[in-house]
From Swiss-Prot:
It comes from Cutibacterium acnes (strain DSM 16379 / KPA171202) (Propionibacterium acnes). This is Thymidylate synthase. DUMP binds at residues 21, 125-126, 171-174, 182, 212-214. GO terms for cellular component: cytosol. InterPro entries: Thymidate_synth/dCMP_Mease, Thymidate_synth/dCMP_Mease_dom, Thymidate_synth/dCMP_Mease_sf, Thymidylate_synthase, Thymidylate_synthase_AS. It catalyses: dUMP + (6R)-5,10-methylene-5,6,7,8-tetrahydrofolate = 7,8-dihydrofolate + dTMP.
C-alpha cells in the first residue's frame, strides 16, 4: 500500500534520531495519520509477506480476554514469547483491559459494551475501547502500544445505519515490523464488529504518535521502498457468526494475497 510506504519515506526524510527503551535507537516522527478505505480491499501490506495467521490469531486471543501465551502456542503463534514470564503470563495486557477492566463493582467488558452500543445507539460518540489503564501499567509485560480505538457509524442516503469505521490511536509504532500488523489487525476488528452488528466496513483510520524505524531495520526499509505495491486482497468473515465471541480462525478467509518475499528483521524487546 502506497500510503504505508509514504509513512516509511517520511520517517527517513523527516525523522529525528532518538534513543529508546530497548537501546537500539530509532529514527522517528511525531504525529501521522493514514486512512484506509475498506471497500477497496483488505489493507494488508504487499511489499513484504505478512504472516496473517499471527495477525488474525492475536486479535482473536485479545477478544478472548486472554493474557497467557498458551492459546497462541496451541495455534502455532509465538509473537508474544519474548515478553511472557516462565508461566506464559503477560500480566493485564490488551485482552484483560478489553474484556475485564477492573471496576469497584467487578469488571467492565468494554468489547461487549461497545458492540451493544453500536446495535442500540449507533449515533453515540462514545463507542470507545481503551487499553491504557494507568493503574495497571506497572503490572503489564509491555504497556499497550495501540492504546485506544473508537467506532463511528455512517448512515446511507435514507438515514439508516449502514457503515462502520474505526479509528485507532497508537502511542508508539514500530513502523517496519509492527505497524503493518496493527493495520491488518484493526481492519479485521472493524470487519468482525461490522459483521455482528449488521453493518458494512467503511474505513480504518490509523493515527500514530511516535512513528519510528529502528536503526537495525533501515536496510530492510530501503529494500521495501524499492517494491511497488500490488492489489489488496479480499477478506471475508463467516456471516453466520452473530456473537463477537464466536469467531474462530476458520471463520476468516483471505483471498488474492500476492506479496513480495518476507523481509526478516530483529524485534526490539
Amino acid at each position: 500500500m502506497q500510503i504505508y510506504l509514504d509513512l516509511l519515506r517520511r520517517i527517513l526524510d523527516e525523522g529525528v534520531r532518538r534513543e529508546d527503551r530497548t537501546g537500539t535507537g530509532t529514527v522517528s516522527v511525531f504525529g501521522h495519520q493514514m486512512v484506509f478505505d475498506l471497500r477497496e480491499g483488505f489493507p494488508l501490506v504487499t511489499t513484504k509477506k505478512i504472516y496473517t495467521r499471527s495477525v488474525f490469531g492475536e486479535l482473536l486471543w485479545f477478544l478472548r480476554g486472554d493474557t497467557n501465551v498458551g492459546w497462541l502456542h496451541d495455534n502455532n503463534i509465538h509473537i508474544w514469547d519474548e515478553w511472557a514470564d516462565e508461566n506464559g503470563d503477560l500480566g493485564p495486557v490488551y485482552g484483560h483491559q478489553w474484556r475485564s477492566w477492573p471496576d469497584d463493582d467487578g469488571t467492565i467488558d468494554q468489547i461487549a459494551n461497545v458492540v451493544e452500543q453500536i446495535r442500540t445507539n449507533p449515533w453515540s460518540r462514545r463507542h470507545i475501547v481503551s487499553a491504557w489503564n494507568v493503574a495497571e501499567i506497572k503490572e503489564m509485560a509491555l504497556p499497550p502500544c495501540h492504546t485506544l480505538f473508537q467506532f463511528y457509524v455512517t448512515p446511507d442516503d435514507r438515514g439508516t445505519p449502514t457503515w462502520l469505521s474505526c479509528q485507532l490511536y497508537q502511542r508508539s509504532g514500530d513502523t517496519f515490523l509492527g505497524v503493518p500488523f496493527n493495520i491488518a489487525s484493526y481492519a479485521l476488528l472493524t470487519h468482525l464488529v461490522a459483521s455482528v452488528t449488521g453493518l458494512k466496513p467503511l474505513r480504518f483510520v490509523h493515527t500514530l504518535g511516535d512513528a519510528h524505524v529502528y536503526l537495525n531495520h533501515l536496510d530492510q526499509v530501503h529494500e521495501q521502498l524499492k517494491r511497488k505495491p500490488r492489489h489488496r486482497p479480499t477478506l471475508t468473515v463467516n456471516p453466520g457468526i452473530r456473537d463477537i465471541d464466536g469467531f474462530e480462525l476458520s471463520d476468516i478467509t483471505l483471498t488474492g494475497y500476492d506479496p513480495y518475499p518476507a523481509l526478516p528483521a530483529p524485534i526490539a524487546v
